[in-house]
Amino acid sequence: MASRGINKVILVGNLGNDPEIRYMPSGGAVANITVATSETWRDKATGEPREKTEWHRVTLYGKLAEVAGEYLRKGSQVYIEGQLQTRKWQDQNGQDRYSTEVVVQGYNGIMQMLGGRQQQGGAPAMGGAPQQQQGGWGQPQQPAAQPSYQKQAPAQQQPMQSQPQYNEPPMDFDDDIPF
């Protein structure tokens, strides 16, 4: 299938509100979230720090929507990969309106929770965030312990490795001792 372009959005930001969860007549879950991304800079004229925040509408479908509803809260930090879509709808007066949002669904959609576990109320849990090991000789190289939820085609799934990968230099025991 020929592609005529790429439509991919990547966001890392914080939720502005708790997720809104609904269910379609077919039973599939839909979650609506707003994600804030900010950039900061120093004003050249005044030297004062400046900040600009953008708010992004994100819609998640299926299992990702259920996970968002259960685990995400206002202030949660998330990594989102999806596609930009514009939809047309009519308001109460019959006027056509348009909404552009990031849609996370199917095999290309990713939602990863960042920032550790959350307690009730959205505050980070004390000691709840796993400590990531520093890489060194003889220590296993483990991926970050944050849960990642991504839909994948069953044929593309790879078997899980049961043994951790060790970052050790190769040992050559056939060498003579140099003294």
Swiss-Prot record:
GO terms for cellular component: nucleoid. Residues 6-111 form the SSB domain. A motif (Important for interaction with partner proteins) lies at residues 174-179. One of its GO terms (molecular function) is single-stranded DNA binding. Keywords: DNA damage, DNA recombination, DNA repair, DNA replication, DNA-binding. Residues 117-165 have a biased composition (Low complexity). One of its GO terms (biological process) is DNA replication. CDD domains: SSB_OBF. Residues 117-179 are annotated as: Disordered. InterPro entries: NA-bd_OB-fold, Primosome_PriB/ssb, ssDNA-bd. Plays an important role in DNA replication, recombination and repair. Binds to ssDNA and to an array of partner proteins to recruit them to their sites of action during DNA metabolism. Homotetramer. NCBIfam families: PRK09010.1, ssb. This is Single-stranded DNA-binding protein. It comes from Vibrio vulnificus (strain CMCP6). The gene is ssb.
